[in-house]
């Protein structure tokens, strides 16, 4: 009996990863009804990661009230695996740019405090592992707010706590780790990070990502200086050099804070999802793998889900087929990275809106056509 692994990412604004996987399975079953199908919803650590892992691990989502980027109360969701041993958190749920109206965006004031509150809530659930995605932030506070929420005391020269936001880092003089929630050291904390920006400098958090968060040129200079001060105090107080670590600048320096205060590991997002879903164990005896996402082009080779899936499958010599909403310029580059064939699900000229509305039926039909060809190979 054929074993077919179906491991797509979401098709943004059209299908979740699980919906896409089910559409592919439905198409294949029209041709190969008795195969052993293994559906593994995937993600790359960014948007949709919580949903994919929750779906793959038969888990659930939990809604909690936390402090938003500007200090107001927001509702944030995170995922728990079915056995409640793994929590999957997207920092954007608590500290994301979408939570701040455009006219109020200013990373001098926004804080990651709510992200730390999500970490504490996960600890209250008794989890053994936390996967944290750190894209889409509204912040540039170096993870200071997150640290304060889990018990790190960031102090001024006079012993009072510093304020919240990227504009308060210059106040930092001392760091007291004695009140950190001890449970944080008992869990495996892994951070999904797909950028290699350092904390400061021309490729740092403020210069590269500050403008999209509402920072002016003057604000960017100030933020960069404050992050450098923050890094210097961390090195003096904790003996950790974080200013130049690749990924430290992710999410406005949250990467640096997670490394400095919580000894977190920064790992490419798709690798984390592969681990969490037990992908390697499920793929090693497969006949072939079907993956895909909304668009495949020359950028797909830079850490996107189909490439992560393909590289993992190729460790076991398993062929990989990708289906995309569209095949963009340079998509052939994926053939050098483990994908054996790539197909578009669009069978004729149609608008983007039409294709997205019909995504599941188009994906099912494309999968059916691929299944026909694969069955020819088995019968010859």
UniProtKB/Swiss-Prot annotation:
<dbReference type="InterPro" id="IPR018193">
    <property type="entry name" value="Glyc_kinase_flavodox-like_fold"/>
</dbReference>
<dbReference type="GO" id="GO:0005524">
    <property type="term" value="F:ATP binding"/>
</dbReference>
<dbReference type="InterPro" id="IPR036129">
    <property type="entry name" value="Glycerate_kinase_sf"/>
</dbReference>
<keyword id="KW-0547">Nucleotide-binding</keyword>
<keyword id="KW-0418">Kinase</keyword>
<dbReference type="InterPro" id="IPR004381">
    <property type="entry name" value="Glycerate_kinase"/>
</dbReference>
<dbReference type="GO" id="GO:0031388">
    <property type="term" value="P:organic acid phosphorylation"/>
</dbReference>
<keyword id="KW-0067">ATP-binding</keyword>
<dbReference type="InterPro" id="IPR018197">
    <property type="entry name" value="Glycerate_kinase_RE-like"/>
</dbReference>
<dbReference type="Pfam" id="PF02595">
    <property type="entry name" value="Gly_kinase"/>
</dbReference>
<comment type="similarity">
    <text>Belongs to the glycerate kinase type-1 family.</text>
</comment>
<dbReference type="GO" id="GO:0008887">
    <property type="term" value="F:glycerate kinase activity"/>
</dbReference>
<keyword id="KW-0808">Transferase</keyword>
<protein>
    <recommendedName>
        <fullName>Glycerate kinase</fullName>
        <ecNumber>2.7.1.31</ecNumber>
    </recommendedName>
</protein>
